[in-house]
Design a protein with these regions (language model features):
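P-loop NTP-binding core
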Residues: 1-144
Length: 144
């Protein structure tokens, strides 16, 4: 069974085009009839806003902290499925304090890999436990 390619957009600096690139890739891949999931790992939530996802419902914070599953948090938008983020994600750093915490995202993404062609991860402009989780889970890194 084919598995999704996970692509992470990352850079320690803000304003370099990470979110814009994720939005563009969503459009390109979906125009080629590819199934895409975009995950906003930045507490600022710019990807969520740009893709028209609600930042008031269940978010990646709820998934990472075990309050819900990815299936509960996925929202369908025009070009792709989205797991939104909001400022609450900032608190995840404090909640993720167990051994193996850098593998949480990878483990939670595994069941989704057979349902998508691409999973795109938009990271915050900092080296945090969320960014490390993205690095562990990813197949390819793009550093704009």
């Amino acid at each position: 069974m084919p598995k999704a390619k996970i692509i992470t957009l990352t850079n320690q600096k803000g304003g370099v085009g990470k979110t814009t690139t994720v939005c563009a890739l969503c459009g390109v891949f979906s125009s080629r009839n590819k199934k895409v999931l975009a995950i906003d790992l930045d507490p600022q939530g710019n990807l969520s806003f740009s893709l028209g996802a609600s930042m008031e419902g269940l978010t990646i914070h709820d998934v990472i902290t075990g309050k819900c599953s990815f299936d509960d948090a996925i929202e369908r938008t025009e070009n792709c499925d989205v797991v939104a983020s909001n400022i609450l994600l900032s608190g995840s750093e404090l909640e993720l304090n167990s051994a193996g915490r850098e593998f949480i995202l990878k483990e939670k993404l595994e069941p989704l890999k057979s349902r998508y062609d691409y999973i795109l991860l938009d990271t915050p402009p900092a080296l945090s436990i969320l960014t490390i989780n993205a690095y562990v889970a990813t197949d390819d890194l793009i550093v704009p």
